């Protein structure tokens, strides 16, 4: 099917309440650039998942080095080795999670190693929506796992080092730019 809008994934055949079948761009539900058809209610939609899709393409920067995702007991103090240039510390009633450079983690710590970190370039207002969805959706479609860390200004995607090439391919195919490879 020829695309009627930016992504053929948004075009679906629908059947109206009167039984007429036609193609409809689902972006028309929230994007004013697309016409809203039909005037009658849709009673069946073949496969469309009602979701908001960000229409912005983003730039991600692959940071140097490998990272680890570590788990310590909930009551453990924050260790000194978790204070590198890039690190994230999250405490919950169940655990203390630390994301940091793989080189900083001492032996004997429960962790998963071999992660690469992609930083979302720029600063984003906390009220912006669809940013992570536009980045994670192509990875989910490609069956690629990730771990996300957010800060006040931006987000970081951690992906397995063995999947980095596939992640870059999925993101660039979706229209995003990946630098620092």
Protein language model regions, located:
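Short beta-strand micro-motifs in enzyme catalytic cores
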Residues: 21-23, 41, 68, 96, ...
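Regulatory modules associated with amino-acid/nitrogen control
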Residues: 51-138, 166-181
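A structural feature that tracks compact, well-ordered secondary-structure segments
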Residues: 129-162
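Cysteine-centered metal-binding/redox modules
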Residues: 1-51
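Short, flexible segments with low predicted structural confidence
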Residues: 16, 110-112, 142-143
């Amino acid at each position: 099917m020829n695309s009627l809008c930016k992504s053929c994934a948004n075009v679906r055949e629908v059947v109206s309440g009167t039984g007429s079948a036609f193609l409809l761009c689902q972006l028309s539900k929230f994007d004013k650039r697309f016409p809203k058809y039909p005037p009658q209610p849709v009673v069946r939609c073949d496969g469309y998942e009602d979701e908001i899709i960000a229409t912005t393409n983003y730039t991600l920067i692959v940071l140097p080095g490998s990272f680890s995702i570590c788990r310590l007991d909930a009551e453990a103090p924050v260790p000194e080795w978790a204070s590198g240039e890039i690190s994230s510390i999250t405490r919950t009633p169940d655990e203390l999670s630390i994301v940091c450079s793989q080189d900083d983690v001492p032996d004997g710590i429960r962790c998963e190693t071999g992660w690469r970190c992609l930083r979302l370039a720029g600063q984003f207002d906390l009220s912006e929506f669809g940013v992570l969805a536009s980045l994670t959706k192509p990875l989910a479609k490609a069956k690629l796992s990730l771990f996300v860390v957010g800060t006040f200004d931006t987000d970081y995607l951690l992906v397995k080092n063995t999947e980095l090439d596939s992640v870059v391919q999925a993101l660039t195919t979706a229209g995003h730019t990946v630098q620092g490879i």
